[in-house]
Amino acid sequence: MEETFVPFEGIKNDLKGRLMCYKQDWTGGIKAGFRILAPTTYIFFASAIPVISFGEQLERSTDGVLTAVQTLASTAICGIIHSIIGGQPLLILGVAEPTVIMYTFMFNFAKGRPELGRNLFLAWSGWVCVWTSLILFVLAICGACSFINRFTRVAGELFGLLIAMLFMQQAIKGLVDEFRAPAREDLKLVEFLPSWRFANGMFALVLSFGLLITALRSRKARSWRYGTGWLRSLVADYGVPLMVLVWTGVSYIPTGDVPKGIPRRLFSPNPWSPGAYENWTVVKEMLQVPIVYIIGAFIPATMIAVLYYFDHSVASQLAQQKEFNLRKPSSYHYDLLLLGFLTLMCGLLGIPPSNGVIPQSPMHTKSLATLKYQLLRNRLVATARKSIKQNASLGQLYGNMQDVYNQMQTPLVYQQPQGLKELRESTIQATTFTGNLDAPVDETLFDIEKEIDDLLPIEVKEQRVSNLLQAVMVGGCVAAMPLLKMIPTSVLWGYFAFMAIESLPGNQFWERILLLFTAPSRRFKVLEDNHATFVETVPFKTIAMFTIFQTTYLLTCFGLTWIPIAGVMFPLLIMFLIPVRQYILPRFFKSAHLQDLDAAEYEEAPALPFHLAVPEAEMGSTASYPCDSEILDEFITRSRGEFRHTCSPKVTSSTSTPVYNRNLSQVFSPRVIDLRGEMSPRLSGKGQNSPKPSPLNPSSSSK
């Protein structure tokens, strides 16, 4: 994205770039046919279940003023509008946890003011949305999105861990409430007797932990040893919503003398009931709000605008990572302007606004990368087999595949397609008799399936159809509210805990916290797997000090959310991290260390070679290669949807650049010694499972 602070310049450039490919955004999705339903269904479940959970949370926090009907309606309406006239169609919109927190603060404030009360809460929140939209308009017009690159890893990961803590807090709070009687229920009912409250709470623990454990296990289904590839992929992609259905079914097992209200279930009015559509006419009541509160609404509006500016921009950034090789232009400024209009519309309708969400946005891009991979792969395999039947040479075969690849690319005037990767020398030697591209292909040696996997670059099917369809499906959930009310609330608390835990892998802040609690004598185990590069390049004392600073800042933000009125200010602390990172931290940490600890990309160092490689013959000749979804899962973090970058060990300016050495695997960074504490038993050769020396003499075997 080109930085520009000229008013309207960024919006104009975004519109110009996206209008050039608007037609292809629709035709590309339509040409995909029924295949587009797979990523559509995948992202629908990833969007709908959290929104339903947030609706239950809002129902409890706002005394039933806002429910799942409103959160689903907001997600559907904003998603449909954005998919049609939005700039970046890969961006997924939805009601997010920060919005729920801000609306909870505003409701508690309005409830405690006689001039507002519960009745004028939605009218006052409408004024908050009016102010929020005006601030977003100003930010978009002035090109504030040009600062998106200033949001470094420090701010992003701290914000992600804060959201994870709030998710877990809500899960724990919800489970504790399962042992208590609800505030708005008749306490004389049999299900609210002490013995039945205890039974409800214990059953809630079973359902919550059951969903949590099985959902976490299903996410790793692609690495299971059992089942076919398509079955493991199905469980990995749709296992979480499937587990929601399974544990909802388990909740209906108790019968007989068990009261009807056990376990407690999702409460929300049906969309056609009288009380469900009162908020749609809230615009009529906005003039009843006292003028002092209309002006005062600017304060929470500023916090929400800052929050949306940060969250929406980062979600769009993660959906457009350079590793996805997107060919169509970005649209940060225009999308922020559109978000202002959507926020205004939601405020006037009396529903909570939606904004770009993480990790659904990068998940959407990843699912479309899988779709594009499948479409290209099928055509290239057919082309390769046809060329081999015609006794074509390897050069002709590669040229035919390149032609088919170019034919399947969307013709863009301003950008050429990337093209297939180059053939590897080992492929040429293995598949031809003479090592010449003009030689005929040896069909017995040329593995079409595997070789094409190596040639295909990562690409994304950039289109609008999947975003539109998933938003329409979310809207269909509003009509299915009688079915949604069959879900136990305890299952939703388990899902909150799942979202909190699932967001931790890939968060380097969390990984450093775990490193601090690792015994010094066991720190070497961190090096036995792929690990972040700072583990080898930054002294442990510096890592500890940096992590303690982040933890203190995180606890300050989390503690602020507990303060009734001042809690609305927590987004300012997140934004304040930008000047803190730029001007304050360099005074306490070396710039080289900060660059590694606050890297722009998720960089990984390879595992140190503590064990001998397993000979390929021992794996068997029928070993299957990982599918494209499994490969992408290994490369992308769960917390923010980032690509992991494997890089070589870094050297300081005071050391000479190392040249290739066959014994280089035995040379470690000086910082590795600090981490070890004591040498690994496997490395020293004294442990029970330490590798035995190879019987082959390297010098003789190479001759």
Swiss-Prot record:
GO MF entries: solute:inorganic anion antiporter activity
Function field: Probable boron transporter. Boron is essential for maintaining the integrity of plants cell walls.
All ranges on the Extracellular side of the membrane: 57-75, 142-155, 217-233, 311-337, 502-557
Membrane topology of the entry: Multi-pass membrane protein
Region Disordered, residue ranges: 678-703
Topological region Cytoplasmic: 1-35, 97-120, 177-195, 255-289, 359-480, 579-703
Gene Ontology terms: biological process: monoatomic anion transport; root development
Keywords: Anion exchange, Ion transport, Membrane, Transmembrane, Transmembrane helix, Transport
Family assignment from sequence similarity: Belongs to the anion exchanger (TC 2.A.31.3) family.
Cellular localization per UniProt: Membrane
InterPro entries per record: HCO3_transpt-like_TM_dom, HCO3_transpt_euk
Protein's name in the database: Probable boron transporter 2
GO cellular component term, pick one: plasma membrane
Lineage: Eukaryota, Viridiplantae, Streptophyta, Embryophyta, Tracheophyta
Signal peptide: none
Transmembrane segments: 36-56, 76-96, 121-141, 156-176, 196-216, 234-254, 290-310, 338-358, 481-501, 558-578
UniProt cross-references to Pfam families, sorted A to Z: HCO3_cotransp
